[in-house]
Regions:
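Formylglycine-dependent sulfatase
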Residues: 2-8, 13-14, 22-432, 436-479
Length: 479
């Protein structure tokens, strides 16, 4: 029995009727869906957002084919929670994944992969997982194999994926199974990481690529990590096409998360820059090449017009790296704009007009309701969903968001609507208010100038936090 089979009959019957209407209409062929997420890529780390140093011609080309989302947010200021929001359409605190390396994606959550698998999609996950451990038997990544973490074991096939090739958490961006060589040798960045002696450069990093229950892949793991991932993604897509099945895949690159490692060829493309920039930008360019490879493959299979690609990052750039948040305040682990406003675009040839730059506030929690809207599918039950469909934004230029975006991280909380942002960095003891339409860099706190706006937003935030708390306690689950 699948999770979806436990959903109340009336909801399932509603979805079944919608499914029949879609399947019977030949003009509504189900699109392929690729959700790409980079790791710690800052808003200002791509050419399409104005970076003059980084070389990202393929990502920029893809962005130009669709809508660039200037005001797109990660649901959290760090990795794991944002990923939970993509999977569920819910704020990560609802799912009890509040921080990196905490919690896991619970059985009671309904994921986008599960819903699409029920709709006949082939489903695959590639890259970082970070939503639980991938082994009970061996030490792996940050948490895998430790007795205290056995409760957090949950693999992608438990959440709707047919297949996967993924790591529990971070890996080096080049030679991902090997500890990086010393910073002095120019082969890795030393941003808080202990460098190792050259003679120890072949020591294992301590992570594996998992492909099944207690099963790892040990082949083709040398070189650029983004290329290693794409070597698995392309065959998955080809198999799906050959089987005449629409496909859904989450492509979660590790780049440019620490430890950032780049090969000589990519470093040399930035020879005029300092070593740290050579390595950081080099690994981004290596990832960009794989995005170009992905697009060429879609074109060669004549499915580029049948495929939706949504691209974003999981949070802002890491501190003390060459990563850029552009004009936005602070970086990763902050709920100010630089920590959660991330580069993003959406493309679907023939459906989303190219060359757009949209200021509509959107968030990673919007992915699930947007995809369901495109497919004309209802969510299977009535649990709270924080995201909303941005399909009318992408196709009809809708201007205003229906519901604000709430954020919770550590001792920070924030409430963002179409114009204003209410934020606290001390668990709600004090607040600041910013007009994001006129002050994108959050330089002027206007809470004393707009007390009525702040008061209403505080009340709404308080109600939302209570709803989130109820969900976190498991009140949304049917078991």
């Amino acid at each position: 029995m699948t999770k979806l089979s436990r959903i109340p009959l009336i909801a399932m019957f509603s979805c079944f009727c919608v499914t029949l209407s879609v399947a019977q209409n030949s003009e509504n062929k189900k699109p392929n869906i690729i959700l790409v997420m980079t790791d710690d890529l800052g808003w200002g780390d791509t050419g399409f957002n104005g970076n003059k140093k980084v070389i990202t011609p393929n990502i920029d080309m893809l962005a130009s084919k669709g809508a660039i989302l200037d005001r797109f947010y990660s649901a959290s200021a760090v990795c794991s929670p944002t990923r939970a929001s993509v999977m569920t359409g819910r704020n990560p605190y609802r799912t009890d994944v509040p921080h990196a390396n905490q919690g896991h994606l619970k059985e009671g959550e309904i994921t986008i992969a599960e819903i699409l698998k029920e709709q006949g999609y082939a489903t695959g996950h590639f890259g970082k997982w970070h939503l639980g451990t991938l082994t009970k038997k061996s030490r792996d990544g940050n948490r895998g194999g430790k007795p205290k973490n056995l409760q957090h074991y949950t693999i992608p096939t438990s959440h709707g994926y047919d297949e996967y090739f993924c790591s529990e958490s971070k890996v080096p961006t080049y030679d991902p199974m090997i500890r990086p060589a010393t910073f002095e040798k120019g082969e890795s960045l030393h941003f808080g990481w202990k460098s190792v002696d050259e003679k120890k450069s072949t020591k294992k990093f301590g992570s594996a690529y998992w492909v099944g229950n207690e099963k790892i892949d040990t082949t083709n793991l040398d070189g650029d990590d983004s290329r290693i991932l794409m070597d698995r993604i392309i065959p998955f897509i080809r198999r799906s096409v050959n089987q005449k099945k629409p496909f859904f895949t989450t492509v979660w690159f590790h780049t440019p998360h620490l430890p950032v490692v780049s090969d000589k060829a990519h470093r040399e493309r930035y020879s005029s820059l300092n070593l740290r920039e050579q390595i950081y930008f080099g690994t981004i360019t290596a990832m960009d090449e794989q995005m170009g490879r992905l697009w060429l493959m879609l074109e060669s299979l004549n499915i580029d017009e049948e495929t939706i690609i949504m691209f974003c990052s999981d949070n802002g750039p890491e501190k003390k790296t060459p990563g850029s948040a552009s004009i936005f305040r602070q970086r990763k682990r902050s709920l100010y704009e630089g920590g959660v406003r991330v580069p993003a675009f959406a493309i679907w040839k023939g459906h989303i007009k190219g060359g757009q730059r949209l200021e509509f506030p959107s968030v990673t929690s919007d992915y699930l309701p947007t995809i369901l809207d495109i497919l004309n599918i209802e969510f299977p039950d009535k649990r709270p969903i924080d995201g909303e469909s941005i399909w009318p934004v992408l196709t009809e230029n809708k201007k205003l968001r229906d519901q604000p975006i709430g954020f919770l991280f550590a001792n920070k909380q924030s409430w963002v609507n179409n114009q204003y942002k209410l934020i606290s960095v001390d668990d709600g003891k004090s607040f600041e208010l910013y007009d994001l339409l006129n002050d994108k860099s959050e330089k002027e706190n206007i809470i004393n100038k707009e007390p009525e706006i702040a008061s209403v937003m505080k009340q709404d935030l308080k109600k939302w936090i209570q709803s989130v708390t109820n969900s976190k306690m498991g009140k949304d689950y049917n078991y």
